[in-house]
Curated annotation (Swiss-Prot):
Residues where heme b binds: 74, 106
Similarity annotation: Belongs to the globin family.
Protein name: Globin-2
PROSITE patterns: GLOBIN (PS01033)
Quaternary structure (record): Monomer.
Highest rank taxon of the organism: Eukaryota
Length: 150
């Protein structure tokens, strides 16, 4: 299933949740490195997205991005937000509240273009569980909630 950022998706089945947890546990064990790798891949593949991050100005190479403490800090925030969503799969109300709060911040304080949530979600999905429909469904849920304040 392709990742979507509007509408709705069907609830995750228990089997999908178990598969997501197993795949995510592997990625999250090394969350600092994997988070940075994901964010670097995002910025090198989508350089226009850096415009929303003034602290990242001038970081034009993968090596420069990886060495930046600001990039590492933001990568950790992203990976931990996904981890919170994975941990909240059985409590979608909790997941919704956290992600809707992030949506408001990104829409009203940071003015991030919501199209980038879907791009980043695709990179996270490809890194964690390439081609897995359940993980893509979770990423869709996250994108839909992150787009809710737009």
């Amino acid at each position: 299933m392709p990742i979507v950022d509007s509408g709705s998706v069907s609830p995750l089945s228990d089997a999908e949740k178990n598969k997501i947890r197993a795949a995510w546990d592997i990625v999250y064990k090394n969350y600092e490195k994997n988070g940075v790798d994901i964010l670097v891949k995002f910025f090198t593949g989508t350089p226009a997205a850096q415009a929303f991050f003034p602290k990242f100005k001038g970081l034009t190479t993968a090596d420069a991005l990886k060495k930046s403490s600001d990039v590492r800090w933001h990568a950790e925030r992203i990976i931990n937000a996904v981890n919170d969503a994975v941990k909240s799969m059985d409590d979608t109300e909790k997941m919704s509240m956290k992600l809707q709060e992030l949506s408001v911040k990104h829409a009203q304080s940071f003015y991030v273009d919501r199209q980038y949530f879907k791009v980043l979600a695709g990179i996270i999905a490809d890194t964690t569980a390439p081609g897995d429909a359940g993980f893509e469904k979770l990423m869709s849920m996250i994108c839909i909630l992150l787009s809710s304040a737009y």
